[in-house]
A protein has these predicted regions:
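Surface-exposed helix-capping loop/turn segments at secondary-structure junctions
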Residues: 128-137, 178-184
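Extended, well-ordered alpha-helical scaffold segments
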Residues: 114-122, 162-176
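GST-like domain detector, emphasizing the conserved glutathione-binding G-site
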Residues: 1-122, 129-134
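GST superfamily/GST-like fold recognition
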Residues: 135-160
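Alpha-helical transmembrane segments in multipass membrane proteins, preferentially the mid-helix core
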Residues: 125-127, 151-152
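Short, flexible loop/turn segments with low-complexity composition
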Residues: 80-86, 181-191
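Acidic/histidine-enriched, glycine/proline-rich intrinsically disordered or flexible terminal extensions
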Residues: 187-206
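Acidic, serine/threonine/proline-rich low-complexity intrinsically disordered regions
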Residues: 109-114, 155-162
Length: 206
């Protein structure tokens, strides 16, 4: 049996989602190991003690622990200055406010509405940029939309009511894509000794 790189992932995690999107787009075959975060596999913890997903172990033993670095490796993606700026804002300021909007009870002294408003500054800027040309590359869209999706899903009625037509259209296109459907295929948590699960699966198996 042909050896394959191993990807430890968690289906709903936006960081893991962006890594899987790159893998699907490129047709980069891996063995997918779905993780239960409260019971992380021993092998995953051995190769990546920080214990977060995604983790990609290459055939030569190299371990890539950051989602953006996995995207760059799989896609051979060299970010432009604009792309790097958007990813930095997404992973920095937006993710900071997203976490406090979605999980206010995890943080002391947090006002949920305040963080929704602060996150909306980024989303409004994103809406403006999406109305311009040239449009975002698939790689950049895939790096960003899982986090916007998470924000939108927390209160979809509120999100849909905002004056962000370009953002709404972009997100819906991302979610309706064949690549996203293949990225989000449901699998059972991995257990040691089971038959390996190839990812992405052949199109006809979804």
């Amino acid at each position: 049996m042909e050896p394959l790189p191993i990807l430890y992932s968690f289906r709903r995690c936006p960081y893991a989602m962006r890594a899987r999107m790159a893998i699907v787009r490129e047709g980069f075959r891996v063995e997918l190991r779905e993780v239960v975060l409260r019971d992380r596999p021993e092998h995953m913890m051995e190769i990546s003690p920080k214990g977060t997903v995604p983790v990609l172990q290459l055939l030569d033993g190299t371990v890539i622990e950051e989602s953006l670095e996995i995207m760059q490796h799989v896609l051979d993606w060299e970010l432009s200055e604009e792309e790097a700026n958007w990813v930095e804002r997404n992973d920095g300021e937006f993710k900071h406010h997203l976490d406090r909007y979605k999980y206010p009870n995890r943080y002391e002294g947090v006002e949920q509405d305040e963080h929704r408003a602060l996150a909306s500054v980024y989303l409004s800027d994103l809406n403006t940029r999406l109305g311009q040309q040239p449009s975002f590359s698939n790689a950049l869209s895939d790096a960003l939309f899982p986090f916007v999706r998470q924000f939108a899903n927390h209160d979809r009625m509120w999100f849909d009511a905002q004056p962000w037509p370009n953002l709404h259209a972009w997100l819906e296109a991302c979610l309706a894509s064949e690549a996203f459907g293949r990225c989000m295929v449901k699998v059972k948590p991995w257990v040691s000794g089971q038959d390996r699960l190839l990812f992405p699966q052949a199109e006809g198996t979804l």
